[in-house]
Amino acid sequence: MAIIRGIVLYTRQYKDNDLLVRILTETYGMRTFLARGAKKATSKLSAGTQPYTIVTFDGALPKRETGLGYMNDVQDIKVYSRLIEDIEANAYAALIASLIDASFEEGEKITRWYNQLYVALQKLDEGLDPQIIANIFEIQLLVPLGVAPNLRADPITGQVDGKFDYSEKYNGIISEHHFNLDDQRLMLDQKTVFYLRQFSVIDMRQVHDIKMSAITKRGLQRVIDYIYEKQVGLKPRAKSFIEQMHSWQNTLVNFRRNK
């Protein structure tokens, strides 16, 4: 038995009243725990199995890397109310959780990412822009996902200042002096390039109220989506839901304008 602390990423039903709980633990990496009876209304485990809850529990680690652990008794929980009540914040939290889950092996020690996610959930609960929080994860998780685009300097000259654009051909940014080498570059505006580069290295603790225009947000999301489609080949269900949600919002805005 052990006292285990972690962040609940998601749950899956297992038999009638049991749940499989996917948890990013503080110490033991990504693990799946069986919570017997957690779906019962009277279960003491119920509150500790809600997605994006910080939970400390008495349990057992899997005996094998791919096996199940057990959640026996919840000691302490921290719940973020906005992530329950705000559908947009909840959707972006789900996207971040899906990407982290896809990026690392079972049991791989990823304390840095535990800390990043812990702070990110706090930021989301405080009302910071959920798209910006998710964009930071989308960009930084490209490295463990095996893409690792070069966003630091021009690959030909090492230039770090000036105007840049994103090139799939060169797997990252190229300076304006080499725009002619790739006629398929993304033609990004410089504010988008700035945030793309900044978000690749920023620590979540440094993120405060970032103000970004709607145009720049769309541009940044466009390049991120391009990289995930063309180079990663990953699109979580939460991503599709977010796109549908934005489509509904745009339809509603246009309807109100035309009334």
Swiss-Prot record:
The keyword rRNA-binding does not apply. It comes from the Bacteria. InterPro entries: ARFGAP/RecO, DNA_rep/recomb_RecO_N, NA-bd_OB-fold, RecO, RecO_C. GO terms for cellular component: bacterial nucleoid. GO terms for biological process: DNA recombination; double-strand break repair. The keyword DNA repair applies. Belongs to the RecO family. HAMAP family: RecO. This is DNA repair protein RecO.
